[in-house]
Amino acid sequence: MRIRTSASTSNLGPGFDCLGLSLNIYNIFDVHLSDTDILFNIDDAYNNDDNLFIQAYRKGINCIGIQDHISVSFYCDVPVARGLGSSSTLIVGGLTAASALHGNALSKQEIFQLASEMEGHPDNAAPCVFGGFCASFSEKNNKYITRSLSFSDNLKMSVFIPDFEVKTETARAILPESYSRNVAVNNEAKAIMMVNALQNGDIDLLKECAIDEIHEPYRRTLIDEYERVKEIYQKDTEGVLLISGSGSTLIGLSDRYISDEASKAIMNLNHNWQKRDVKVESLGVVVINEQ
């Protein structure tokens, strides 16, 4: 059985922990039932019981009421610890494998709930499961709610991926414990307007509401050359550059792609920045073939 999951960018400026967008960068997993858990084509650091795919698979089969083992071959294109939802690709992949190998015992909604529980927030899990542009939130009883939103075809997106990681734990630890009412209200209003801008491809509105006050002012200090990349991108495209998830990847949105000259200027900086033009992945997690 082959399962495909997609990268995602979350937050999208002021939509902290609630907005997420699925991107056409993929991880693929070939999964089969086995006598023991065996992992192929994966770094030694992840070839153990802490592997998120295996953890998610076990969580899934526990919910179904089955105990068994799998062999998994990993073909991964989503970079780790770069703010592109790599953990969600593994978790959603493992849960989907548990479901698909046992008669599709879990619905996509159940997979989303379980994945969000494992992540602790739903902003990457939702687009990874359902695809497209999603808004999500959690209730106090750990019930997660998500809805799919439209996303403008007029927006052109590029991700800029450096050669260093930013761990989610580090990116969360740097944030304040509390915010003033004024900051909270302003950011909430911007998040609402951000959805409108992304749905309608409104670049002028996008520029106004993309200035986040909750996480970006703090997390950008963890991303060396952030200001330089932002300067080059915005001067060339007149768009906006945002931190993807917790970083270190940055994502640019405009009505046109960045020029080759500006791309080279970014790639020639100190951190071996890689530029990839990306599009929205609308399908979410896919079981490509069943055996």
What are these model-predicted stretches?
Residues M1-R82, T96, A100, N104-L106, ...:
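ATP-binding N-lobe of GHMP and related small-molecule kinases
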Residues A7, I25, G132, I161-V166, ...:
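Glycine-rich beta-alpha junction loops
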Residues L12, L198-Q291:
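Glycine-rich, charge-dense phosphate/pyrophosphate-binding loop(s)
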Residues L33, S138, P162, G252-R256:
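Short beta-strand-to-loop capping motifs
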Residues L84-K108, V129-C134:
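DPxDG-like acidic metal-binding loop motif
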Residues L106-L155, L241:
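Alpha/beta catalytic cores of group-transfer enzymes, especially the acyltransferase/condensing modules
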Residues V159-T221:
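Active-site rim beta-loop-alpha module in soluble metabolic enzymes
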